[in-house]
Amino acid sequence: MNYDNYINNSIKTIPPSGIRRFFDIANEMDDVISLSIGEPDFQTPWHIRDEGIRSLEKGKTWYSPNRGFSELLNGISDYFERKFGVKYEADKQILVTVGGSEAIDLAFRTLVNEGEEVIIPEPSFVCYEPLTVMAGGKPVIIKTKNEDSFRLKAKDLEAAITPKSKLLVLPYPNNPTGAIMAKEDLEEIAEVIKKHDLLVLSDEIY
């Protein structure tokens, strides 16, 4: 039986992650410091681990509500208001996911229609392109430059926009370069976004 005949054609176009291949190779070697995957180099703080243990002891091992536990949703809402001065309604505007990749996947599949374009600055997180393809969209890549400190420039964004452009991914602080957008750059990009009525996915995992 040729199982390839049963695979979604869009999946066949997605190559395996090169960085994951390096990760697997490094894991098999001794005395190697792996710089392949961006993850914290510190343990989860004990007060967080203790709370997880307490939840298990209380029997919270079942399905959660679809949006997440109300205590967590309210805590997230309070954090954003305290930290950034913005108010999100816990029961309407916040959704808890199992990690950032699931959040990006859900956002793309919710917002992107067949053939619509998702603009992605590179270098970037390896999942943006395949998740765009799986959502039926078309990745449009903007190569950021070393001389710009790998920051997205408004003129480059403007040049990449077409009538099919739907969404811009803003991955800053950037994975993997660590680049941070200057306020002036963001203000210029905001004008382009408003001019063309683009949606923005702000991936702030770093």
Q: What positions do the PLM features span?
A:
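N-terminal small-domain helix-loop-helix segment of the aminotransferase-like
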Residues: 2-3, 8-99, 106
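Helix C-cap/helix->beta junction micro-motif
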Residues: 29, 135, 195-196
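Short acidic capping loops at alpha-helix termini that bridge into adjacent secondary structure
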Residues: 88-94, 114-117, 164
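Conserved PLP-anchoring active-site segment centered on the Schiff-base-forming lysine
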Residues: 108-132
